[in-house]
């Protein structure tokens, strides 16, 4: 019987709990729980639940169970709100935590302690994940079964979604053939056709591209569905259509429903998630930060409602849940907890890189495979249960892919999710994880249904999958015209090609097709679905929380980009110091109007400097847009919650910069000394910076591409600059432009600065001869309103512009989409035309052979370049043959053996290779004390001619690192060890000539075609002895080998934006190296991102290359059986860069299998299992732990290691009579030929860059017309010195802003090409000087055209004197000014690590160019200690040349305030310090600046390397 005192205390405890029901503070809850536990007796039935009903004597474990029962009972008494946020966490027996443990009969007993799930500490979360999901794939399944059992026990129905689609058609209208190339001519035609289209005239010749044709099907919940199909079959389009994310410009028809609801009846972006094949992330954030942000934006969805319902049912049924399941469900159901992130990190294998930044092109971060997993994880951390996953395994090894797909399968089966996954090369064991298969080909569904029936269907059609052939690989090849015949099994019938429409018709008659049609004909029963299955609200997280989350992210990104802001601040300080010493107080006076104009000039300079300081926001904002668009499309947040933090977070840095600037310049320059005016001046500087940042942000948001944004930014500054009232006073502005004066923010900044200064007592207490106050007179001369109230009006206007620009920025983010979509280039010829052309090509090759050789050529034989060149050169090689099943896998005859072009077979040996990098700061901050991190450890091996070597290992094992080290591509780190080429120490300069490297990232010049890319590589890298005709034949044959012939005229494009698809780019990367005819080829994941058929094509090419006697090494991630067994030898690495196997594969991989099966504890390989996948599985880190063995140590003690070391020793000595590699020159081609070829490529690049060249020509045209109308006939109005200053201002603005624009817009073009340059230079194609010279020369014709357009408009409209000499000089000065500004922009990029730094650096020098141009402060007024810089300022020489060439000989008289009338010629000499007879020197100096900037660009591109490898 219970003790009465206990009963009273229990009642008191319960009363206390209810009294605090409204309080949600975790500490209060814990305090109440503690009191309840101290006073509560054990409940017999509850205790029995935990300890198990038994008559045995109570033990320590029973006491612990009683304690847990008491805690559950106490939890049940909490208010619902607190109860759903409090869980029980296990505490180890030896921990110092609250829990108490005991050990008995060999078992460890655990107690639990209560925790607030919202405030779980990092250590608690990590301990929970480590304990519950120790071996991710096994423990995840066990845990999810327990979670599902809890839900089923309570009788809760899980919300599910069934996706149906009926008769979906998608098509696009596009140009075909060369008309699709983005040349200047084609784009001009497009613009003309669009304008004519507006008036109903349609001359555009477009072709309909059918992407999806009448597809229907069902994606069911609780079933894993695999989407397969060859490239360009429409897989991505189907996934986008089902997710409701299709481009609105596409023509679509048909119906897509979720549980019977159309896409317009709910919010598909919140219900379903499309996981893209493109990895778009903020490179500055760590993996965990990226996922935390995603989780906070997506919220918890219906998880909290499900938990409430579950807790209610369990309370009614008297069920107590498993503490770990309960804690997990509670922690993942409340906002603010990050346990969901920790869980996803663990099951996707990202926990080991959780604190590593993602990285980008110039910032080292996680690997490509890890980025791919991060893209998947970003959506898995959310509550979405409908997932459309597009090629999520690219770049992952098969073992990792298997683990991820298995974890997703567990989530699907246990959580009743709806998932459709497209994979490129699923291994057989991965294929087995799927329940259903959907096969897409040519935009039509060939099969959809259970995996078990797919082979039955194709056998009925007459095709069978061979043994040791993956079913997925078979499915992707069986519909292909080139691959189908090998699978034909109806020997009694002659084979004929079965087309895709025939397969579709046969499927409709197949029993699965009939079943599918029947199910689609029955409407979905909406009454049976769970109410929360679909999401009907666009907002799942409160606006305030989203705002806080976005602010935190912006602040984090700002800290990670601190270099940019520090650089900007330091630059501002330097410019402020320079400006202070130019406008030095001791040199300035306040005596008359001339002195006032100097102060006005100083204020204008302050204004322009702070205006230009916002220019960096252009590139910073543009860099953020791709990630924003992705988040916006997922409805992570509203656009304004991205824009507002962007503004708010930058306010402190802007305020700091403003204070620093004003503190340095204000009193040093000698502005009005009153404190109030100091702070008013500071306010205007700050508001001006905010306005400028807002202006450049909205420019980036509206334009969205780098070149157009930079051009628009320059245009905006030009309009504000010219119409701001300080170059051309308001009264002198033509009436048709006065509106722009009032719309220019610089107008108000100019008024505010001038009014604040000139209304100070030191100006207002003095008078000019006509009786006006000096301050008023200066303001009138400057065209500024004299009423002092204008200061506040102008400051308010700046605030208004700031708000307006930021609102417009938000609207642009809300309504505009990113520019550029993936495009398809259709060949213009029909099939028959293609066949005719193909016949001509073959006839041409036959003709060559017939001329050179007496042997007849069979009309049915396969003509390969191997044979052609053998016959042409009489050169052949006899090497041992080897047959491989995959070579004929596509029904082709293997090419004849032989050397395509003469070359020397070479082998490579390496001994004890170690590679270290400096310890990352993230690891040092976690307590790691070592200074270096070892990535490769004691690797030895050899690569030999005619032997194809696979370099394998799990993600992060160091495969790419080893290849970079051996090929000499590493730019940092510390390398130890010996590398030999045919027995001689490796010399990188000669090695680059005989080697090729296919990088994992497909980096190519975006604006040239496929064939042009190959011609460029071949003509630069093949020896001079090979004539041009042979090179072209060779290129065409390589294109045919890698099946790029149909795409030879397709533009390469930028990844994910336009041009080639991922797999097409991969094949191009390989072809670019193959046309160089190298002796040793490194290939970094050549089949990554390819489907099985494309991978087979690539591997056929690789095998053919090896068979010619070359040495080829490939890293490979997910090889099918066919591909894996095409290799001869294997070098297998484990994490940490250690070798665990180095030797031959053997027939059917038997040697590898035998080696690992001989290790104690390793399970035997299953029948038909892929040896590559099995090998990675049995040698994984988890296997090492389970078997208690170190595979690296086992290998080092094996006879295989001894044989490898012996081979390395043998091959490290040169053969007798051999010579080391020698080339008379470093490069294959002469410097002049390199220049010609680089110029050829640059010419096509520029011709096909309308966003650069058309835009800048348009800018020049617009600027010319605008300035011509603003300064209309200004050359005729020359009565006073004020008129002359306006004329000079017009010329200054006219030339300067086109120059600035050229400098800004060339930078992104050069930056993109610089990335390609790094790859091509590393490949030994050319030296830096010819490349740079070609880039310099190709600009000249475009700048010339720009200058012609500009001067022919500006010169007559401004009414300058029409004499040949004066026009020539105006043209000459303009041309060289535009040219040196262009080269200055190129130089800026060459000395900067990225575009952001280049833009900040550029803005600083634009400011200094302005300051010392001689316009704002004439040379005679510049302090003598700064005159030297005046002579070094290129813009000063431009202004000098413009003024002297136009007015150096004018003898007319003009009025000068306060002085007698003067002639123009002596006035120019006295006021500006210009000598009219100095024009020849000016011309030479302008040409000299052009050469200097071009040379500096070339020198910098040669010596500086910002690539990190």
Swiss-Prot record:
Membrane topology per record: Multi-pass membrane protein
Compartments (UniProt record): Membrane
Binding residues annotated for ATP 2, in chain numbering: 953-960
Entry keyword Transport: yes
Main location: membrane
Binding site for ATP 1: 229-236
Keywords: ATP-binding, Membrane, Nucleotide-binding, Repeat, Transmembrane, Transmembrane helix, Transport
CDD domains, per database record: ABCG_PDR_domain1 (cd03233), ABCG_PDR_domain2 (cd03232)
SUPFAM superfamilies: P-loop containing nucleoside triphosphate hydrolases (SSF52540)
InterPro entries per UniProt: AAA+_ATPase, ABC2_TM, ABC_trans_N, ABC_transporter-like_ATP-bd, ABCG_dom, ABCG_PDR_1, ABCG_PDR_2, P-loop_NTPase
Molecular function terms, GO-annotated: ABC-type transporter activity; ATP binding; ATP hydrolysis activity
Family: Belongs to the ABC transporter superfamily. ABCG family. PDR (TC 3.A.1.205) subfamily.
Function of the protein: May be a general defense protein.
Protein name as it appears in the record: ABC transporter G family member 38
Gene this chain is encoded by: ABCG38
